[in-house]
């Protein structure tokens, strides 16, 4: 009789419970993004936290806080929307390159954390106003600013020395609106 867990016939929690520390994480059923907090607490010592941090869509800020020494902070910084308060609280743990690329940050937050922001990624992925860009002209990546931010012709003229000469300002495909 085969006592191997059958991923097609059981929930992720059942599969992990039955497999224990021998769980094949590649075979965990698709409902894995619904592991309960109680389940994660009970099995915290055998869960693959890289896998949980990447796959678990209902991993809330409170759950991340509870399991802060177990989660993979690169995945946490990438795969879920984090509040600025949460990022501030865990500023020593988050991956700032990923935060600058994947989180939505206010200009005020970027100003307060200017030494942590990855300006190359922020210049491409964060919405920045002309006043903000002007204030941080020595930090921003002008190639990305000229490609991905909406800039007025007056601003372009004023900051012409910073703007790469070969830039055609393809703002019609700007990912930031």
Predicted regions and their residues:
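Alpha-helical scaffold segments
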Residues: 2-177
């Amino acid at each position: 009789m085969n006592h191997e867990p059958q991923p097609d016939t059981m929930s992720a929690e059942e599969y992990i419970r039955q497999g224990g520390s021998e769980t094949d994480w590649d075979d965990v059923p698709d409902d894995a993004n619904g592991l309960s907090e109680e389940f994660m607490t009970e099995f915290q010592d055998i869960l693959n936290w890289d896998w949980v941090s990447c796959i678990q869509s209902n991993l809330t800020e409170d759950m991340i806080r509870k399991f802060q020494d177990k989660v993979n902070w690169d995945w946490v910084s990438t795969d879920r929307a984090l509040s600025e308060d949460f990022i501030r609280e865990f500023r020593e743990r988050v991956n700032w390159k990923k935060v600058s690329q994947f989180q939505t940050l206010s200009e005020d937050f970027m100003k307060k954390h200017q030494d942590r922001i990855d300006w190359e990624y922020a210049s491409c992925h964060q919405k920045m106003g002309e006043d903000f860009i002007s204030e941080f002209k020595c930090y921003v990546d002008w190639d990305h600013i000229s490609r991905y931010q909406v800039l007025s012709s007056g601003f372009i003229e004023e900051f012409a020395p910073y703007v790469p000469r070969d830039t055609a300002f393809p703002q019609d495909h700007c990912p930031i609106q």
